[in-house]
Amino acid sequence: MKQHPKISLIGSGNIGGTLAHLISLRELGNIVLFDVTEGVPQGKALDLMQAVTIAGSDIKIKGTNDYKDIKGSDAIIITAGLPRKPGMSRDDLISINTGIMKTVAANVKKYAPDAFVIVITNPLDVMVYVMLKESGLPHNKVIGMAGVLDSSRFNLFLAEEFKVSVSNVNSMVLGGHGDAMVPLARYSTISGVPIPDLIKMGLSSNENIEKIIDRTRNGGGEIVALLKTGSAYYAPAASAIEMLESYLKDKRQILTCAAYLQGEYGVHDLYVGVPIMIGKEGVLKVIELQLTTEEKALFDKSVEGVKKLIETIK
């Protein structure tokens, strides 16, 4: 891949702007910041260019309202769409954001058919499905940002519970990116020690871990309720950067993302949050975990929720 890959960000709101800032500071590539609102991407691009000048970076950032400017992009991150407001679920956004995603997909197909695409727009599992079907891109090049964010929330709450550094915590969250997501304590560890073992040692309790799991499921809603006029953007942007960097640098990281399943986990023709390996070809492999009967039941329930949402847009 060339020295400065071309990275296009579709949507210049809070997440789009934060993404551009993080990409420029890490010097991951030159940036095209797109939005339909005139002046917004241009203004943010100018502000960001002045910010990276202080950091001594020569990364180029262009703000635009013209899809032609995404031509030849190596990677595209999509945040365009209506954000959640208090009292709204991710699923309430479905009809408006489906229309937006279809327009974005048509332009990605036209101008950047070889790009690696990360979708952030909610409801995530449906939006990434729409992107795949409408763009015609190969499924290994289209993924959704889900589990990295959900796991980061789970990691934080577990670190607080066990009073350890977040760097010691690895957690696993499967399923749809919604209220039926499946945080897995059994596959979550503190310095390699599984959470159930730590409970047996008396360092926490099943009750406390269940509360943490519930808080993780409502992690986005908790922030929406506090902000009142928007939704989370720092953590979603940081999560997408982790995925983007694994692709651009061929790091082959195993990250939980919304991936297209073709029989894995017993699921066909759906995007669901599972661990995948991301490298220079996109999704290199889906990691299939051995789930207990109870875990599989929760996962299947989450999958059913995604299926029902997909049906509403067909």
From Swiss-Prot:
GO molecular function: L-lactate dehydrogenase activity; L-malate dehydrogenase (NAD+) activity
Main enzyme class: oxidoreductase
Name of a matching Pfam family: Ldh_1_C
Entry annotated with the keyword Oxidoreductase: yes
Residues where NAD(+) binds: 11-16, 35, 97, 120-122
GO biological process: lactate metabolic process; tricarboxylic acid cycle
Domain of life: Bacteria
Keyword annotations of the record: NAD, Oxidoreductase, Tricarboxylic acid cycle
EC assignment: 1.1.1.37
Catalytic reaction equation(s): (S)-malate + NAD(+) = oxaloacetate + NADH + H(+)
UniProt cross-references to NCBIfam families, sorted A to Z: MalateDH_bact, PRK06223.1
HAMAP family named in the record: Malate_dehydrog_3
Function description: Catalyzes the reversible oxidation of malate to oxaloacetate.
Family in the record: Belongs to the LDH/MDH superfamily. MDH type 3 family.
Protein name: Malate dehydrogenase
Taxonomic source organism: Rickettsia rickettsii (strain Sheila Smith)
Species lineage: Bacteria, Pseudomonadati, Pseudomonadota, Alphaproteobacteria, Rickettsiales
Name of the gene this protein is made from: mdh
